[in-house]
Amino acid sequence: MSRFLICSFALVLLYPAGIDMYLVGLPRIAADLNASEAQLHIAFSVYLAGMAAAMLFAGKVADRSGRKPVAIPGAALFIIASVFCSLAETSTLFLAGRFLQGLGAGCCYVVAFAILRDTLDDRRRAKVLSLLNGITCIIPVLAPVLGHLIMLKFPWQSLFWAMAMMGIAVLMLSLFILKETRPASPAASDKPRENSESLLNRFFLSRVVITTLSVSVILTFVNTSPVLLMEIMGFERGEYATIMALTAGVSMTVSFSTPFALGIFKPRTLMITSQVLFLAAGITLAVSPSHAVSLFGITLICAGFSVGFGVAMSQALGPFSLRAGVASSTLGIAQVCGSSLWIWLAAVVGIGAWNMLIGILIACSIVSLLLIMFVAPGRPVAAHEEIHHHA
């Protein structure tokens, strides 16, 4: 079992590493490519676009051909794209490399969640996804630090060579450690069960909405945090970095505590707790009389996301034993596109950073609480499938 957990964690971590590691080198990248930092900031959106594009096909391919046939090319593409970025001499080529990086990371991301659905029952999967969420929270803190240490001795291109090395490690794991987990092709008698695993299932759609809104909350916070903390609240850059590190610490602590909480409380209780924390955070930020109270509200955001997101993802994947790849893709596309659409629309309409965050917190909590209370699983689902090793 440990081989599946190690491989899944490695596959997922390519995604945040590809986002956070290069940011520290952005000024030098812009200077070398004769582009402005503002022009290269689009590299984040291009990377997410690549991930979303991969998710359009990766899940279906993973369900038809297996998890390894998607993970291996995905890791290989991430390696090639990382090298391509390091060799880019224009901003156009650099952005093209970032899109290809996103494609590779997206393939690996989808496969990771499908593997966890294949190999774990509902309760263990919720615990593992909570742990995975905690580990993912470490990357935004450690990746820039690692990038800074690399750039003390080497040029910015070395950042992408480091990403390529990470991709090689994931590729080796996928080739030699990961065993195929896709359930064997269903017999004729299993076709009704396969057809019943509809993406239009009310319970699945409710969890898609909940997880998409939750991701929108956390990405809105990350996207607006420089404005909130440095421009509105007046913190210096060093203080901003310290606060963000502390929020990551809160996220990690809660994420690592959630598996223990699942041994005491029902998953539904933790999901309700998550949304109550979001609502409390929104109200706190709306009426905050001081910076200290506002910072407390921010910690509630991090705690709320960490206590509920892994549980909601586990519930969303639960009904899908034969279509776990497609379900994972659907969740990923909804989360990436939904959160990006909200942030873009709020910017176009001219909603300020503070109100943008308060608005999504309150909307997420109200909608999600209603869905949690009124949309229950339609039927019991198989805890997990027996793992079939394919040659």
Swiss-Prot record:
Keywords: Cell inner membrane, Cell membrane, Membrane, Transmembrane, Transmembrane helix, Transport
Keyword flag Hydrolase: no
Coiled-coil parts of chain: none
Subcellular location: Cell inner membrane
Topology Periplasmic: residue spans: 25-41, 90-92, 152-157, 223-244, 290-292, 352-355
A GO CC annotation given for this chain: plasma membrane
Topology of this chain in the membrane: Multi-pass membrane protein
Cytoplasmic face of the membrane: 1-3, 63-68, 114-130, 179-202, 266-268, 314-330, 377-391
Main location: membrane
Membrane-spanning ranges: 4-24, 42-62, 69-89, 93-113, 131-151, 158-178, 203-222, 245-265, 269-289, 293-313, 331-351, 356-376
Any one GO molecular-function label of the UniProt entry: transmembrane transporter activity
SUPFAM superfamilies, per the entry: MFS general substrate transporter
Pfam family for this entry, one: MFS_1
Keyword Nucleus: no
Family named by the database record: Belongs to the major facilitator superfamily. DHA1 family. MdtL (TC 2.A.1.2.22) subfamily.
Protein name listed in UniProt: Multidrug resistance protein MdtL
